[in-house]
Amino acid sequence: MAKIVVTGGQALHGEVHISGAKNAVLPILCATLLADAPVEISNVPHLHDVITTVKLLSELGAEVTIDEGTLAKGRSILVDPRSVTHQIAPYELVKTMRASILVLGPLLARYGTAEVSLPGGCAIGSRPVDQHIKGLQALGADISVENGYIKATSNGRLKGGRYVFDMVSVTGTENVLMAAVLAEGTTVLENAAMEPEVTDLADCLIALGAQIEGAGTPRITVQGVERLGGGHHAVLPDRIETGTFLVAAAMTGGSVTVRRARPDTLDAVLDKLTEAGATITTTADSVTLDMHGKRPRAVNLTTAPYPAFPTDMQAQFMALNCVADGVGVINETIFENRFMHVNELLRLGADIQVEGHTAIVRGAERLSGAPVMATDLRASASLILAGLVADGDTTIDRIYHLDRGYENIEEKLGALGATIRRIA
């Protein structure tokens, strides 16, 4: 099984280009099932989860063509959903990726029936699917859970309705939003997720002919249409990848510019980096961070739904606090079991104390390289970041987690001056 070896001690300098957002491209690919003509998606990142989604669309009968493109143009995927023949998403594909549940709403709305295996994917605690189920039931769906499958049917078109999410759910919002697009009448979603990836999905649906207002706010209003046509959409840049590279620069005392970024989606992260002592300069599509060779200051943070601090950046900032000056307190309010990287960071010499959903991190002058194991996607990134500043070699096992969400991370870090390589 492949591993990554990081040799610490190099400050990062230079420029890096950000890929399309993992958490936007997956629902957008699923949304192509709603159309009755080919849909082209561009700025698609090379990620394992994208490959899994393409396999799932193909399994349903869609014709999928991948254009690898160029470094400047990026990768694009053309989905022709007119050849879809069945509406069952099997366990073999769904078990590896939680986002597979995002075909439920589109299949139900387009074909009146859908069967989707209960999802697998990340091992970071409870991610309930009840928000998806109750939201679709509010649109008139008949849903049962039998033998590990969510089985959904509708008598004719779904009917517009009002649904208040019990809790903010990004994928729940996306699933119900996609279904509502082809429902009869008006749908109002309250307490909807406001993440930029939800807005990007809505922008894609609008480009195909949907009528949606309020995406990016807690209330989304959808006027159902009879059909969606074909079209094109470019996926927005990945704000979590952007944040990860900025934290890497901050931890190493370096100076890095990230291009093809969207700093307007990163306010909470940029605020914390400024608090840590970084000088940050932004344009519409770039962020420059300069630490002037200084050690970062410890920061306190609490994860919460957008526009607050993202849970997907928690592990990276924990790594930063491990080598920062002072004590940082991290509160994780979104997912349980999202401190699984703590034990691995301790192996590198970090000083972390966990009390329930809170981690208290006392910054150390230095970390020492050691063999560690990735437990989930963002944890694997935090271990690479810690390895960048640890003495000697840090060998990270089970990096298949990393390939689910970061495109060519070792090449990108290497271009900034990191000593990093992948070994068999």
From Swiss-Prot:
Sites of 2-(S-cysteinyl)pyruvic acid O-phosphothioketal modification: C122
Superkingdom of source: Bacteria
Subcellular location: Cytoplasm
This protein's record includes keyword tRNA processing: no
Catalysed reactions listed for this entry: phosphoenolpyruvate + UDP-N-acetyl-alpha-D-glucosamine = UDP-N-acetyl-3-O-(1-carboxyvinyl)-alpha-D-glucosamine + phosphate
Active site: C122 (proton donor)
Primary localisation category: cytoplasm
GO molecular function annotation: UDP-N-acetylglucosamine 1-carboxyvinyltransferase activity
Keywords, sorted A to Z: Cell cycle, Cell division, Cell shape, Cell wall biogenesis/degradation, Cytoplasm, Peptidoglycan synthesis, Pyruvate, Transferase
Membrane-crossing segments per the record: none
Protein name in the entry: UDP-N-acetylglucosamine 1-carboxyvinyltransferase
